[in-house]
Structure formats: structure tokens, C-alpha cells
């Protein structure tokens, strides 16, 4: 069977529903609109049956769809940051004096993969200040520390091993991970933020399966945030072929031999054929928008502000920005 590459739970549900024409048992889907035009979708995987069908662990997956032109409007960016913060706060159940460790996963030398390190560079880190100047830093300020550990190819160390060692050394009560994801659809690239309480597997979206970073491996809750920055080239080619076939079917005379041939094409077999034809030439080619540099900069700011607001509930965004400046 042709498996479409995606890290988004909302897309996994869509693929299953399209393939089997029914909802998944053990999965609850809820959609709402906040701040007038920001769509928030909750996908709750409740049991092993749902997890197997979705190909994802049991837990909650929140998808926030960013409005068009958000990257060019500071006001909308702040609105999305507050929606991200609200979604995080629903998943974070942590007293304000407890420590949070934020991990920016990814390769800072590769723009589509640099979202994690970029977010870390915009965070309000306070753990060191709470120790160095306890009289100046208010008790309501949460101790937050952050790291961008790089990738195995740069460090020679599994990212999961680095994080596990840090957790054992500094004893945080929560880990928040940020990583780049792969999407099924081009229109979701850099236009969607996924938040989950199930942890993350670095590099899984592009086929690099590393050590899992989750509560089971670290012993503390792990919240994962991700933004799709790439799409599999084979998926784009397959979608283009689907559009061509659909248009040819619409223009063909119903009941005629050519119409029947087009209508009986197995789309699953077609997807597998396209994948096998492209593999010798492009391998696992991933495609990203040409404006990815600007997109990563703005999305990282949105996510960083969302994390800052969620981890520092006693501060407003204006005060956080003053602190950072």
C-alpha cells in the first residue's frame, strides 16, 4: 500500500477517512475557530486501536492553522502566539515554581530544519537568573532553561541521549521540544502548528528514525511542538497526477471506453508506481517553499512567544519582550 508521508495527526485522520470512508474507532475529532479566523483542531487518540490506525501514540494532538499573510502582520502573529499559549496551557499542568527545559531540535545549518534552534534563540530563559539574582527576579517567574543540541551528523551523539543526560543532571519537571515536520499537503507547509503531549521522534518526518523523546524515555512529561516545513516530492507528483486524471474524467464522455479506463485507475497503485519511478532519480527528495528563510524567522517568533506566555503565565507579552530586549 502507498503510504503518504506526514507527521500531522489531522492529516493521518483525513487519509484514513478518505481511504476507508469512515471515522477511526478510538479517535475523537473536534474543530473550532478562535480569534475570528484561527482554526484549532483537536485529535484525541483514546486507545490502542486508534493509535494503530493513526500510526501515532495515544494522546492529544492540537493543530493550529495560521491565517494567510500572518508572516507579514505582527498583530496576527501575536494573536496566533496567544492561541499557541492557550493550547500549551491546556497540556501543561505544572506549578509556576517548577522548572521547564525547552529543546530546539534540528540542524541549524539547514533552513527548513532550523525551526527548533531559531525558537530557542527567542526564548525567555530564567533558570540561571533565579540562582544568580534571586532578590531581583520575582518568585512568580518560572525557571526556564533551553538548549539546541544539534543533530547526530554534527555532534556524533544521539539527540535523545543528550536530552536524557540533561534531564538527569538538572532535574526539570517538564520538557518542551520543537522540531520541523513533514506535511501531506503543500498548503499546510509553514501554515500549521501541531502541539501534542506524546513526545517526539526526531527526524521521523524525513525517514530518519532516532531515539524517542517522550515521558517513557525521560520519566517526565514531554510536550512537542512542530511546524511542517517540507513535503515529499513523490506526494506532490502524485497529487498533480490526481488533478490531471480528475480533469480528464470530467471532460471524457461518461460510459465510453476511455472514461472507464480513467475511472478504474487504482490510485493506490498509481502512488506506488510514481514513488518507484522517482526513487532512482531523486530518492527521498523533500520540497520546501522558496521563502523558507523568512517563514522560519516569523514562525519561530510565533512559537517562541507562545511558549514564553505559556511558561510565564504571570507575565504579559509586552513584559516578556522588554525582558528579551
Swiss-Prot record:
Query: Which reactions fall under this protein's catalytic activity?
Result: Endopeptidase action with P4 Glu or Asp, P1 preferably Glu > Asp, P1' hydrophobic and P2' Ala
The identity of this protein, by name, is Germination protease
Q: Keyword annotations for this protein?
A: Hydrolase, Protease, Zymogen
Q: Does the keyword Cytoplasm apply?
A: no
Family in the record: Belongs to the peptidase A25 family.
Keyword match Protease: yes
Organism, as annotated: Clostridium perfringens (strain ATCC 13124 / DSM 756 / JCM 1290 / NCIMB 6125 / NCTC 8237 / Type A)
Example of a GO biological process term: spore germination
EC number, UniProt record: 3.4.24.78
Which HAMAP family does the record match to this protein? Germination_prot (MF_00626)
Q: What Pfam families does the record tag this protein with? A: Peptidase_A25 (PF03418)
Amino acid at each position: 500500500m502507498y503510504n503518504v508521508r506526514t507527521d500531522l495527526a489531522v492529516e493521518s485522520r483525513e487519509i484514513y477517512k478518505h481511504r476507508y470512508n469512515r471515522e477511526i474507532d478510538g479517535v475523537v475529532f473536534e474543530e473550532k475557530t478562535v480569534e475570528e479566523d484561527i482554526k484549532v483542531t483537536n485529535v484525541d487518540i483514546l486507545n490502542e486501536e486508534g493509535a494503530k490506525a493513526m500510526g501515532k501514540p495515544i494522546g492529544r494532538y492540537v493543530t493550529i492553522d495560521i491565517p494567510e499573510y500572518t508572516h507579514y502582520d505582527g498583530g496576527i502573529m501575536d494573536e496566533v502566539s496567544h492561541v499557541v499559549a492557550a493550547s500549551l496551557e491546556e497540556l501543561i499542568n505544572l506549578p509556576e515554581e517548577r522548572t521547564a527545559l525547552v529543546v530546539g531540535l534540528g540542524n541549524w545549518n539547514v533552513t527548513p530544519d532550523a525551526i527548533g534552534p531559531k525558537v530557542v534563540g527567542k526564548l525567555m530563559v530564567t533558570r540561571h537568573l533565579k540562582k544568580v539574582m534571586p532578590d531581583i527576579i520575582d518568585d512568580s517567574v518560572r525557571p526556564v532553561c533551553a538548549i539546541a543540541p544539534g543533530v547526530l551528523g554534527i555532534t556524533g551523539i544521539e539527540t535523545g541521549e543528550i536530552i536524557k543526560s540533561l534531564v538527569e543532571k538538572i532535574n526539570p519537571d517538564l520538557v518542551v521540544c520543537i522540531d520541523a515536520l513533514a506535511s501531506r499537503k503543500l498548503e499546510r507547509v509553514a501554515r500549521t502548528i501541531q502541539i501534542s503531549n506524546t513526545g517526539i521522534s526526531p527526524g521521523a518526518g524525513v525517514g530518519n528514525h532516532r531515539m524517542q523523546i517522550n515521558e517513557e524515555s525521560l520519566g517526565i512529561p514531554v510536550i512537542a511542538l512542530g511546524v511542517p516545513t517540507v513535503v515529499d516530492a513523490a506526494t506532490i507528483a502524485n497529487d498533480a497526477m490526481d488533478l490531471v486524471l480528475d480533469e480528464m474524467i470530467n471532460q471524457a464522455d461518461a460510459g465510453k471506453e476511455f472514461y472507464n479506463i480513467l475511472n478504474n485507475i487504482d490510485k493506490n497503485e498509481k502512488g506506488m508506481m510514481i514513488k518507484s519511478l522517482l526513487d532512482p532519480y531523486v530518492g527521498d527528495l523533500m520540497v520546501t517553499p522558496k521563502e523558507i528563510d523568512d517563514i522560519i524567522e516569523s514562525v519561530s517568533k510565533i512559537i517562541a512567544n507562545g511558549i514564553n506566555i505559556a511558561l510565564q503565565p504571570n507575565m504579559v507579552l509586552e513584559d516578556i519582550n522588554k525582558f528579551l530586549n
